[in-house]
Each structure stands twice: as structure tokens, then as C-alpha cells.
Amino acid sequence: MTTATAEAQASTAQPAGVGRIARVTGPVVDIEFPHDSIPGIYNALKTTITIGDRSTEITLEVAQHLGDDLVRAISLKPTDGLVRGGEVRDTGSLITVPVGDVTKGKVFDVTGEILNAEPGEKIEIAERWPIHRQPPSFDHLESKTQLFETGIKVIDLLTPYVQGGKIGLFGGAGVGKTVLIQEMVQRVAQDHGGVSVFAGVGERTREGNDLIHEMEEAGVFDKTALVFGQMDEPPGTRLRVALSALTMAEYFRDVQKQDVLLFIDNIFRFTQAGSEVSTLLGRMPSAVGYQPNLADEMGLLQERITSTRGHSITSLQAIYVPADDYTDPAPATTFAHLDATTELSREIASKGLYPAVDPLTSTSRILDPRYLGADHYRVATTVKQILQKNKELQEIIAILGVDELSEEDKITVSRARRIQQFLSQNTYMAKKFTGVEGSTVPLKETIESFDAIAKGEFDHVAEQAFFNVGALSDVEEKWAQIQKENG
């Protein structure tokens, strides 16, 4: 079924039927309905599990029609306690989530239940939208290309983000994807004053808890809606939670006419959940065991993340790369949809340089003088050339040592090392680890600073003065302190 059909179905809810559970296989439940009231694909079903004196209502989503009045549904909660013959009610509509200002400062699950409501607190929900929706039509799309300034030097200079674009943060385990996403949540609220929607897809519950506390401390929680479907949730929840968050973001864009930031951590878990659901539904797997409709599933999500006339959803997606293999179908399928890719390198992280962005492999479609201006493009290209030349010289240095290089190459290596150190930056989220306050560097200052280093104006300053600082004024201050300590 197309999303168009699904949306139409949501707006004209069918008469609800009542069915009986025929079979339960993990999160997959087969349900028999009367012949004249079989629920449509994507319809939300409800049933109640009673264990002892405790009753819990769970939601299921119809995934297949099996024939003989049977439908196959995926449960969004654990199915422990479900029994054959149990009653299941068709809601007559798709899964819906609350939208609007009521979502700010709230934590939701995939079905729109509020997880952080105070005991006895009554929350008025005026409007709910179905999570399966059509992407904006072609004539409503915004063709303007505009830089999204982050205040992080390595990103703004070498892999600039697009307003209303899709940005991927690639990296293996433990290289700083989640920390960088948390940093961006804080910067957007502080510097742009915009609304953020955060989707926690199949990540650690501890990280979600830490994020909420950090946002409360930073005073940005009230401008953010959070939707979580964590690692311990069934695959149906992890597959749908990104759509729930995206629906909330679409309301801010389309109805309130705001620019929105959508954070998804982690888009790989969305693909992984799709693979699990596909296997549970009995589909034949494709390459590396992924679902045969991998590209289609990814497209349905990514096509809805876009700019409409005057308003945008800018999305930042953390993408786990299994075993650091970029040819894996999951990250490879995501690449096709992105406007900018920020690759986080284990090698750079091991040197203690954060954000651990690889300046040579990270890319952006707007790294072009038509979009950025001649100065920005010239400096970015020069910096990349110096870093590339340094990378090529490392083999010679490893065998023969620095002394065997020509004078020109020695200068290149020296400047490259200063640039590498200066690409690191003290971030707000890392303050608890480093004790150093975060910094925001304006784009103009970033361009001028790297231009000066590339031209050799700071060749006299020791490398360590460039480490983990914001602006060049911080470098000069640190250098004066080092000289003072050394007498």
C-alpha cells in the first residue's frame, strides 16, 4: 500500500472490527477477523495483556493480509502474556502521534504516549497526525541552497551543512556520533532558537536519559520534542519511531511555518529493525541478510525530510558503520540521500582530536564557490591540499624520518600538523570530560584563521597551542601562557 492510500485511510477511519488471536510468534501476531471487517495495511490494532492483577494495553500494526480472513501484525510492545483466542480491536486508523506545541519538552514513545508526564498531570492533546504520510509534492519543494552555520570549525569550513538538507554522521562504535548530535541539539537551540525533534532509534537507554538531563541543564529541553524507541524495544517500534518523530517535525514545518531540526540517532538501527521485521514476516533476504525492500523503506523516510517553500526540516542522522565497512548495504543505501557526509575517524579520535571528523573523506555538495563564495572555497581547498600532501608524506617520514624531506615538504608537514590540531575544538557537551567551556566560531573568523595558518603566519607558534581551542585569539593566549611557563 502506498502512503497516499494510507493517509486517505487515516482520514476516513473504517468501522472498527474485533478479531481473535490465532498465533503468536515473538513480536509477530496472526489475527483472525470477520470477513467483512478486515483491517487495512498499517492499521493500528489494540489488545490487552493481563498478567495477575495487572493489565497492559499494547498496539500492533497490520503488516500483511494472509488470506482466509487472517492478518499478520507486528507488535510494538513485548508480547509476553498474549494467548490464542485473545480479543484484538481494530482502531480503524493508522498509528497517530500528538503534534504541535504540546510536544515540546515532552518525551514520547512510538505511539505518542507521554513518558515524562507528572503523576496526575492532565495534558490536552488537540491534534494527532498519522505517522504514514506523503512527502511534499514536487511543486511545493524549495530549490534554494543555503549554508547552515554550526559554529564548529571543521564542519563549517570543510563539510558545510545545507539548510533543509540531510546530513549523515558516519562512524564505527565509540568515535563520537552521539556526542556530536547532542552538541548540535544544544547549538541549534542556543544560536538559532529553532525547534528540534530528536528520534532515539534503537540506541542505549542510558544515552537517552543522559541527553534529557543535559538538555534540562542547558535550558533547551522546552524547545525540543523527543521520541524514543530504544535497544530493548521490539523491532516494530524501532522501525516506526523515526516516522513518529518526523511527523511531529512536519507539523512544525507545514502548519507553524518553522525551520526544524530533526535528529535521528541511529539510522542504522532503523535499517536493522526493518531487516528483523522482514525476516519475521518471512520475506527472502537480499545482500548480507538485509531486507529486499531496503532502498524503498529508506526512501519513504528520507523523501519526507525536505524543504518546502520558505520552511525546512534539516536532518542530522548518526549512521553506525558495521565493522567500519562503508560498502555494507545499510550505510551505502543511506549515502544516496545525503547532502553532506561527516565521517568520524577512529584514527583521529585515537589522537584525542575531537570532533574526530576526517577532513579528507567528509564531503558536502555545497563545497562549491557558487554557494560559498570564492574565499571560503579557496581556503577549504588549500587546507585539504595541505592535509592530503601531509598524508602522502607520512610513508616517507615513517621510513626515513622528517629530516630527509625537502625544506618545502617540511613546511607543509609543519603547517598540516597545526591545521590538524586547530580542527579540534572545545565543545559544550565535552565540558564534563575536559573542564573547558565550549566555543562557537563565526564562519568568517574560521575562514580567516585557516587562511592565516595555511599562509604560514603562525609557523612560529608551537603545535600544542592549537589543540582544543576555538578562535585564533585563544591560540595566541595559550601560546603566551606556554612561553611564560617555559620561561
Curated annotation (Swiss-Prot):
Task: Write down the Gene3D superfamilies for this protein, in alphabetical order.
Answer: 2.40.10.170, Bovine Mitochondrial F1-atpase, Atp Synthase Beta Chain, Chain D, domain 3 (1.10.1140.10), P-loop containing nucleotide triphosphate hydrolases (3.40.50.300)
Q: Where in the cell is it found?
A: Cell membrane
Q: Does the keyword Chloroplast apply?
A: no
* PROSITE patterns the record matches: ATPASE_ALPHA_BETA
Membrane topology per the entry is:
Peripheral membrane protein
Write down any Gene Ontology CC term.
Answer: proton-transporting ATP synthase complex
> What residues does ATP bind to?
171-178
Task: Describe its assembly.
Answer: F-type ATPases have 2 components, CF(1) - the catalytic core - and CF(0) - the membrane proton channel. CF(1) has five subunits: alpha(3), beta(3), gamma(1), delta(1), epsilon(1). CF(0) has three main subunits: a(1), b(2) and c(9-12). The alpha and beta chains form an alternating ring which encloses part of the gamma chain. CF(1) is attached to CF(0) by a central stalk formed by the gamma and epsilon chains, while a peripheral stalk is formed by the delta and b chains.
Q: What's the protein called, per UniProt?
A: ATP synthase subunit beta
* Annotated EC: 7.1.2.2
Give the catalysed reaction(s), semicolon-separated: ATP + H2O + 4 H(+)(in) = ADP + phosphate + 5 H(+)(out)
**Xref: InterPro entries:** AAA+_ATPase, ATP-synt_VA_C, ATP_synth_F1_bsu, ATPase_a/bsu_AS, ATPase_alpha/beta_chains, ATPase_F1/V1/A1_a/bsu_N, ATPase_F1/V1/A1_a/bsu_N_sf, ATPase_F1/V1/A1_a/bsu_nucl-bd
Which family does the record claim for this protein? Belongs to the ATPase alpha/beta chains family.
Physiological role: Produces ATP from ADP in the presence of a proton gradient across the membrane. The catalytic sites are hosted primarily by the beta subunits.
Any GO MF annotation of the entry: ATP hydrolysis activity
Q: What is its main location?
A: membrane
Q: Does the keyword Ligase apply?
A: no
Q: From the UniProt annotation, give the residues forming the signal peptide.
A: none
Keyword list (alphabetical) reads: ATP synthesis, ATP-binding, Cell membrane, CF(1), Hydrogen ion transport, Ion transport, Membrane, Nucleotide-binding, Translocase, Transport
